[in-house]
Curated annotation (Swiss-Prot):
Protein name: CCN family member 4
Biological processes annotated in GO: bone development; cell adhesion; cell-cell signaling; glucose homeostasis; negative regulation of chondrocyte differentiation; negative regulation of fat cell differentiation; osteoblast differentiation; osteoclast differentiation
Native source organism of the sequence: Homo sapiens (Human)
Keyword 4Fe-4S tagged: no
Glycosylation sites per record: N86, N143, N284, N343
Its biological purpose: Downstream regulator in the Wnt/Frizzled-signaling pathway. Associated with cell survival. Attenuates p53-mediated apoptosis in response to DNA damage through activation of AKT kinase. Up-regulates the anti-apoptotic Bcl-X(L) protein. Adheres to skin and melanoma fibroblasts. In vitro binding to skin fibroblasts occurs through the proteoglycans, decorin and biglycan.
Disulfide bonds: C49-C73, C53-C75, C55-C76, C62-C79, C87-C101, C93-C115, C273-C310, C290-C324, C301-C340, C304-C342, C309-C346
Domain IGFBP N-terminal: 45-118
Family assignment from sequence similarity: Belongs to the CCN family.
Listed InterPro entries: CCN (IPR050941), Cys_knot_C (IPR006207), Glyco_hormone_CN (IPR006208), Growth_fac_rcpt_cys_sf (IPR009030), IGFBP-like (IPR000867), IGFBP_CNN (IPR012395), Insulin_GF-bd_Cys-rich_CS (IPR017891), TSP1_CCN (IPR043973)
Top-level taxon of origin: Eukaryota
Domain CTCK: 273-347
Domain spans labelled VWFC: 121-186
Amino acid sequence: MRWFLPWTLAAVTAAAASTVLATALSPAPTTMDFTPAPLEDTSSRPQFCKWPCECPPSPPRCPLGVSLITDGCECCKMCAQQLGDNCTEAAICDPHRGLYCDYSGDRPRYAIGVCAQVVGVGCVLDGVRYNNGQSFQPNCKYNCTCIDGAVGCTPLCLRVRPPRLWCPHPRRVSIPGHCCEQWVCEDDAKRPRKTAPRDTGAFDAVGEVEAWHRNCIAYTSPWSPCSTSCGLGVSTRISNVNAQCWPEQESRLCNLRPCDVDIHTLIKAGKKCLAVYQPEASMNFTLAGCISTRSYQPKYCGVCMDNRCCIPYKSKTIDVSFQCPDGLGFSRQVLWINACFCNLSCRNPNDIFADLESYPDFSEIAN
């Protein structure tokens, strides 16, 4: 029996090895049986993007106030869709106007939407809630605006410098009936001044407190940008050039360019900008149904084919008299444009922080 056991083990081992070798050398199956997963039906959802991109040779000309952007396919330039327009994955809404595409009305495809306004976050100041974009005055010294949860304020009281050296003891005091403090000159001398300022004349200083408006330092801020890029708008400034030496807001009418004239068609061949546009015929200004008593031939700022914008470079303010159908008349200050220049620093008239940016370099100017 002892010699029979090793022989049996050797035979079993050889048989197992033959089975493994036969399995390894057997041909692999040529087909596999499986059930594919059902594909998603996309026929009901249109495809708005096509690849490769097919773009027109030149970008479109957008109306004034409409952004020229890259479409949602990241292919071509397009005029952004505006509030209430239809939008898709290709035709996107104007991001510079805070618009987004609302697909809620196209369930369940969610393919075509409508451009809607993004509702910004309101603000709370001293327990009072303000809406996004709302301007308000928490007190008589500041004018504030709520901007998406943040409050930005501009002072209404001018931080003028103290009186000149001839006023030995200047101090700020509260004047009854006025919000902002004013400088007064308190002179302790009991004798006449040796050197009186030229703009006030010679007078005796007897120790009394004289109102600072008698020593008024005239200040006038620059005019703000026109409130509209085309058509009739308003610009404002602050000035204390008045009998009370009190800062007051002044306003004037402005019209940078007409909305109903396509100035792009007037740009000469080979040029990219038309800095100034002037109609050939004179016209009368109209305001609230009233007509100016005389005709004018105003100049307007033009437009560019690229990303530059044209703004007034030399201008002045004129008084225009209006006559109404009922016989009443009035006059208004109006911006009169003499020259314009075109540059890359296009700023939003509603941006209260635009003045913090640097002035455009002269290399960007194109007359």
